């Protein structure tokens, strides 16, 4: 069904195509063959662990716990997911997060007794504008309210509203700071009679660039040049 039916897996001229071939079944196969070659050539002089994550698209809820157990003490970690067109190697990547904002108001007839109500939609609008001020493209920090809904009818003061917020950030410090700022903004009430709650936070931590990572990239670059790759 779906993509698998529209673009089924096939092998033609020694090349495999289809969903997941590049991202990242080919990387998994490459890992296995590389490990086998290193072992046969006697080039493994330290413990090496291969780990395959089955739930990465969901945020690795299960695999992340295993990673936390095997990573301490590791000299290096290499991910065989494709980095980009032309064989690019990724040495850093932004983290991401999701937050879910809910606002409760009080319903009333918008024509007969408007003042008896408290609009959750107006309140979430104020909060959304406040949250948007944390956007900082120069720092690589994005804060996006991508989904919003609320109310029951056009002639009713909205008794509820909710939104979903997506975050990306380059450093863990920036991610933690923006989550704290969003929670603070949500705690401030503009429309009397409304209340709000927010859940969620950082989902995937950033892969921050560092000196050790740059040194590892240098080794990868040198190895690529030996194979005629640049």
PLM segments and residue spans:
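Acidic/histidine-rich catalytic neighborhood of metal-dependent amide-processing enzymes
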Residues: 24-94
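Metal-dependent amide/peptide-bond hydrolase catalytic core
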Residues: 82-83, 91, 97-230
């Amino acid at each position: 069904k779906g993509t698998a039916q529209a673009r089924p897996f096939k092998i033609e001229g020694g090349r495999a195509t289809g969903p997941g071939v590049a991202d990242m079944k080919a990387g998994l196969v490459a890992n296995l063959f590389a490990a086998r070659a290193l072992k046969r050539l006697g080039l493994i002089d330290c413990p090496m662990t291969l780990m395959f994550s089955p739930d990465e698209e969901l945020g690795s809820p299960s695999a992340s716990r295993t990673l936390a157990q095997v990573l301490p003490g590791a000299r290096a970690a290499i991910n065989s997911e494709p980095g980009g067109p032309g064989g690019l190697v990724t040495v850093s990547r932004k983290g991401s997060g999701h937050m879910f904002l809910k606002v409760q108001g009080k319903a009333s007839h918008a024509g007969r007794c408007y003042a008896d109500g408290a609009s959750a939609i107006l309140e979430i609008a104020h909060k959304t504008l406040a949250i948007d001020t944390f956007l900082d493209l120069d720092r690589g920090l994005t804060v996006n309210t991508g989904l919003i809904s609320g109310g029951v009818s056009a002639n009713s003061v909205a008794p509820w509203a909710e939104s979903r917020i997506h975050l990306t950030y380059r450093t863990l410090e920036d991610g933690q700071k923006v989550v704290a700022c969003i929670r603070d903004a949500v705690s401030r009430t503009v429309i009397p009679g409304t209340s709000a709650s927010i859940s969620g936070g950082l989902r995937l931590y950033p892969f921050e660039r560092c000196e050790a990572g740059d040194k590892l990239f240098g080794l990868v670059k040198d190895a690529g040049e030996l194979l005629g790759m640049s």
